[in-house]
């Protein structure tokens, strides 16, 4: 059985716990949240994981997990993932956009090397990451990502200061530029852009367009890649989580799949 600690108990974390509540190969020992969120977390996980402890940090060495899953946002990488890696605990990371922060990727890699652990960046809401990473081996010429979401998904971002999102009546470009800038300006919306960049041409050479489209109620991801392998084009239409329109439901499923690959006898 794989013993897991999870950082975060928001829409993604709760979705993961619900889908895996009956998996005999997985045990969620702890959920890690800030102190002010402990009571809310206990109430949220009670229907799915009544025996899971709610804590503010990793358990003591004797009770440490086999694996840490980060579902809490960018600050969690510094606060929880770095020390877990240093202790030799493998980590699964959802908030891939955080690695655009200067120096953080290097800090995480150094922690993993010191602890002889591994950090796996999850594909989240996007597909074809395996193909893109394989294509990089032979050489990539261009990777272009276009993310199209309903206006409400851009609330709480710099786009809300630039545009009246409730009044948009046509598709509006809210950002165009490098993946590194997209991830810094739209950290809660740019995990896909960062994941594609890290799998492919890097943060500085991956071109990103982010659109607010009032005619849709789903998150649409469009990826074009060209290189020595040839080329591919991917379109994904992902339903957002009801509890968080900034996040695709597929993100939850990608965490579930990654955990299954770690815990089960056969993986794909």
Swiss-Prot record:
Purpose: Specifically catalyzes the NAD or NADP-dependent dehydrogenation of L-aspartate to iminoaspartate.
The keyword Oxidoreductase is assigned to this record: yes
GO biological process: NAD biosynthetic process
Family of the protein in this entry: Belongs to the L-aspartate dehydrogenase family.
SUPFAM superfamilies membership: Glyceraldehyde-3-phosphate dehydrogenase-like, C-terminal domain, NAD(P)-binding Rossmann-fold domains
Organism for this UniProt entry: Ralstonia nicotianae (strain ATCC BAA-1114 / GMI1000)
HAMAP family on file: NadX
Domain of life: Bacteria
Family annotation (InterPro entries): Asp/hSer_DH_NAD-bd, Asp_DH, Asp_DH_prok, L-Asp_DH, NAD(P)-bd_dom_sf
Enzyme class: oxidoreductase
Pfam family, one: Asp_DH_C
Keyword line: NAD, NADP, Oxidoreductase, Plasmid, Pyridine nucleotide biosynthesis
Entry keyword annotation includes Oxidoreductase: yes
Catalytic activity: L-aspartate + NADP(+) + H2O = oxaloacetate + NH4(+) + NADPH + H(+); L-aspartate + NAD(+) + H2O = oxaloacetate + NH4(+) + NADH + H(+)
GO molecular function terms listed in the Swiss-Prot or TrEMBL record: aspartate dehydrogenase activity; NAD binding; NADP binding; oxidoreductase activity, acting on the CH-NH2 group of donors, NAD or NADP as acceptor
Binding site residues for NAD(+): 125, 191
EC code: 1.4.1.21
Note: The iminoaspartate product is unstable in aqueous solution and can decompose to oxaloacetate and ammonia.
Pathway participation: Cofactor biosynthesis; NAD(+) biosynthesis; iminoaspartate from L-aspartate (dehydrogenase route): step 1/1
Active site: 221
Protein name, UniProt field: L-aspartate dehydrogenase
Organism taxonomic ancestry: Bacteria, Pseudomonadati, Pseudomonadota, Betaproteobacteria, Burkholderiales
């Amino acid at each position: 059985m794989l013993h897991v600690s999870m950082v975060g108990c928001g829409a993604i974390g709760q979705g993961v716990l619900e889908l895996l509540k009956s998996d005999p190969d997985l045990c969620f020992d702890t959920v890690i949240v800030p102190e002010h969120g402990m009571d809310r977390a206990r109430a949220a996980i009670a229907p799915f994981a009544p025996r899971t402890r709610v804590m503010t940090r990793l358990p003591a060495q004797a009770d440490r997990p086999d694996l840490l899953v980060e579902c809490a946002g960018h600050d969690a990488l510094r606060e929880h993932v770095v020390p877990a890696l240093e202790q030799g605990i493998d980590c699964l990371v959802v908030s891939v956009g955080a690695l655009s922060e200067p120096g953080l990727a290097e800090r995480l890699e150094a922690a993993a090397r010191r602890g002889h652990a591994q950090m796996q960046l999850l594909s989240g809401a996007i597909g074809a990451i395996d193909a893109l990473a394989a294509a990089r081996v032979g050489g990539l010429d261009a990777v272009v990502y276009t993310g199209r979401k309903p206006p409400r998904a851009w609330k709480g971002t710099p786009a809300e200061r630039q545009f009246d999102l409730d009044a948009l009546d046509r598709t509006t470009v809210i950002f165009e530029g490098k993946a590194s800038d997209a991830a810094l300006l739209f950290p809660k919306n740019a995990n896909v852009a960062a994941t594609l960049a890290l799998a492919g041409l890097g943060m500085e050479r991956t071109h990103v367009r982010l659109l607010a489209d009032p005619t849709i109620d789903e998150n649409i991801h469009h990826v074009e890649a060209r290189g020595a392998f040839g080329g591919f084009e991917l379109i994904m239409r992902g339903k957002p989580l009801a509890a968080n329109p900034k996040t695709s439901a597929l993100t939850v499923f990608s965490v579930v799949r990654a955990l299954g690959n770690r815990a089960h006898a056969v993986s794909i």
